[in-house]
Amino acid sequence: MDKTSRRDLLKLASLAGIGAGLARSQGSSKSMAGVSFKPNGTVRIGVIGTGGRGGSLIENFSAVEGVQITALCDTVKDKVLKQQAWLDKAGKASHPIALFHSDDHAFENLVKRDDVDLVVVSTPWVWHTRMAVAAMKQGKHVAVEVPAARTIDECWELVNTSEATQRHCIQLENCCYGYNEMMVLNMVRAGLFGELTHGGAAYNHDLRSILFSAEGEGEWRRFEHLNRDGNLYPTHGLGPVAHYMDVNRGDRFDTLVSMSSISASLQQYRKEKIPAGDPRQKEVYKEGDFNVSLIRTVKGRVIELEHNVSSPQPYDRINLIAGTKGIFRDYPPRIYFDGARREDFETLDRYKEKYEHPLWKKVGELAKELGGHGGMDFVMAYRLIQCMKEGTPPDIDVYDAAAWSAPGPLSEASVANGSAPQKFPDFTRGKWQTRQPV
């Protein structure tokens, strides 16, 4: 593996987004669709990226019974030592913990260790695919933060590597494990919405202060806005809707069209908040403030997908699902079914006793105590470890990681070509037609 520096990779990241690509499968020996983990009573985890998000994942995974954090890696030594100290104080370090922090490629030593079953990747996006592939090639399952890939070539690289190594690549889409999302999934499964026709998904989140921060995500995330224009972060809203619609398990994303607004809000924020003469004043942002994409599935369903992290606004993932019998929309959560006495939404309250998801009934109180986006982070961690310990397939596999990440590069290609339609590859190689729903 070449020793490309982090600075060089971040520069390349700014130029790589348009690579919607014409990548094709290289073939494989066996699909990973429906493949179970080998049952394992103790799951040993190595974490790459121990900053803010990585630290939160360490806290949530280590709270699951049967988990051992055996290795930590970050380019900043103090971040590794901070997490080691936390594990020790929390009584989670009764076993040796290997530490890696020499340079940008220290992770290559972590993934080679024989005391790691699962590698968790929580780093800048440009490293996600590279690190996930390295882990799988060393015989490790990998759980990678979102988006798992930034180009269609990277999506195929994840799929091909997972199939070739027979190791799972799980995208850590925590929003699939939110209370409302899992409850609504139960209601969808019970047929309350009838035949599904439409979904709505978004990542609308005012990140201006984070993007211009001198630390954390501010050190790299703003650079994604310099030479990319599309939906840079599609999975938080899209993942739950994909589960509602059985995408990759009875239906499949088929076509996407996308358009972006002008880029104005980051410039306005910079003008008001950043001192004159600061090097950031010279940055030219390509990413539009608001991107909207439409996805059509093979079955003819339509999903509206939004992205806006640059404007003053309340947080909103939309989380909408509609069918022939009713509609649900989140933020705030409200629901309407055909035949209601009045033409107005109602709250979810009277449905909770019957349709609350079993996972939330089982670990919801502990999840809320730990926090982590309202508890969804712990439910996600608990469920993945449950699958590994019991020997069942993961809820979110490499085909989901690829399909849910693909709107990023496909939206860029559509925007760059006058909102021209873009076709989704079939990452499952036809298996979507026979797979069982989550």
From Swiss-Prot:
User: What does the entry comment about cofactor binding?
Assistant: Binds 1 NAD(+) per subunit. The NAD(+) cannot dissociate.
Cofactor(s) listed: NAD(+)
Q: State if NAD is listed as a keyword.
A: yes
Q: Would I find Phosphoprotein among this entry's keywords?
A: no
Q: Which UniProt keywords apply?
A: Glycosidase, Hydrolase, NAD, Signal
Q: What is its EC number?
A: 3.2.1.-
- Which positions does UniProt annotate for NAD(+) binding? G52, R53, D74, W125, V126, W127, H128, E145, V146, N174, Y233
Do you know which PROSITE patterns this protein is assigned to? TAT (PS51318)
Output the PTM entry.
Answer: Predicted to be exported by the Tat system. The position of the signal peptide cleavage has not been experimentally proven.
In residue numbers, the region (Disordered) covers 408-438
From which domain of life does this come? Bacteria
Name the residues that bind substrate: Y203, R221, Y233, P234, T235, H236, Y315
Q: A GO molecular function for this record?
A: hydrolase activity, acting on glycosyl bonds
InterPro entries the record matches? Gfo/Idh/MocA-like_OxRdtase_N, Gfo/Idh/MocA_oxidrdct_glycsds, Glyco_hydro_109_C, NAD(P)-bd_dom_sf, TAT_signal, TAT_signal_bac_arc
Identify the stretch annotated as signal peptide in this record.
1-33
Q: Which SUPFAM superfamilies match?
A: NAD(P)-binding Rossmann-fold domains (SSF51735)
Which family does the similarity line name?
Answer: Belongs to the Gfo/Idh/MocA family. Glycosyl hydrolase 109 subfamily.
Function statement: Glycosidase.
Protein's name according to its UniProt entry: Glycosyl hydrolase family 109 protein
Protein species of origin: Solibacter usitatus (strain Ellin6076)
Taxonomic lineage per UniProt? Bacteria, Pseudomonadati, Acidobacteriota, Terriglobia, Bryobacterales
